[in-house]
Amino acid sequence: MSENVFLPTENLVMGAKDDSKPMEYCYNFKWGSTGTADGQFLRPHDVSFDSDGYVYISDRDRNDIQKFSANGTFIMKWGSEGNKAGQFSVPYSIEIDSMDNIYVVDRGNDRIQKFDVNGTFIQQWDRPKNVNETDQEFASPEDMVVDRKTGNMYITDTGNERIVKLDSNFSYILEWGSDDGNPSNARGKFNHPHGIDVDSKGYVYVNELENPRIQKFDENGKFIMQWGSEGKGPGQFTPLLEHLEIDSNQDRIFMVDGALNPRIQVFNSDGNFTTSFGTQGNGDGEFSKPEHVNIDSSGNVYVVDRGNQRMQVFSSC
């Protein structure tokens, strides 16, 4: 990672604050510990929910997916290390569509796998299904999102420094980002695209592991704006930025600020900072190397507290 990061100032919001009254978040409960037994974690990475409120968590070192009730009771698990159908090599992100199909970004195998809610394998893709060119193969994909209004999918194809848009049948629509597979700090380009989500209006938000910013695009990949700079103040980010998630009820953007400044920042859809919560530690409401966040239908915020090998849940207060 380069030591100096240049961000263009045009369309850049530098830690602006929202004047409306912010929603605050307080610790509610937690579960998990270190280990390989049911309900334990080695390196938890992402969390997602199905329509019945069940919670699914990927674990990069266990190479499995665990399913829990909303209060953290273990239900079942599936997966093991390997490259066969239903196996994983560093499973990163989990995305669940409106039909409760579960998509797992199998980063180490450069593919996306699809399952039902019982962990039954359905199919897999290592590239959009309507293209055969080797340069369209995924390279270390890390995150994906399904637009629940259109069914279209967006994937952070990280090794290729691009975003790939697919339809609900996994057919190629378009892509944007790098033209040559190399990283770039220019607007509309990427330096290790990491997290991605879509708001209620169809705008796409992307954060990068090696750039302290969030970029906003329309559904066709047209650059709209960006915000962020390096630092620890409101609206600033530290290097090794983790993943963003959008609360679909109010389009609030939750950004995990990673290992160097473990906190969750919250923004509105214009990039204005509203609040933050969390600090370094292993107590309730504290984080060590948080990686992912998600918001359930009741507004509860689930944080993957990877360094503490646990899930923490926060509620508005």
What are these regions (language model features)?
Residues 1-3:
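Sec-dependent, cleavable N-terminal signal peptides
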Residues 6, 16-317:
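Eukaryotic scaffold repeat domains enriched in small/polar residues
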